[in-house]
């Protein structure tokens, strides 16, 4: 159970990081 929660949290963190990088690149291109 703990392993599944840890894996889900890691996946969520990776997704959040991808969104932040995508938004950052978009803002750089807009400038």
From Swiss-Prot:
GO terms for cellular component: chloroplast thylakoid membrane; cytochrome b6f complex. It is a single-pass membrane protein. One of its GO terms (molecular function) is electron transporter, transferring electrons within cytochrome b6/f complex of photosystem II activity. It comes from the Eukaryota. The chain crosses the membrane at residues 4-24. One of its GO terms (biological process) is photosynthesis. Its main location: plastid. Belongs to the PetL family. Component of the cytochrome b6-f complex, which mediates electron transfer between photosystem II (PSII) and photosystem I (PSI), cyclic electron flow around PSI, and state transitions. PetL is important for photoautotrophic growth as well as for electron transfer efficiency and stability of the cytochrome b6-f complex. The 4 large subunits of the cytochrome b6-f complex are cytochrome b6, subunit IV (17 kDa polypeptide, PetD), cytochrome f and the Rieske protein, while the 4 small subunits are PetG, PetL, PetM and PetN. The complex functions as a dimer. This is Cytochrome b6-f complex subunit 6. It comes from Zygnema circumcarinatum.
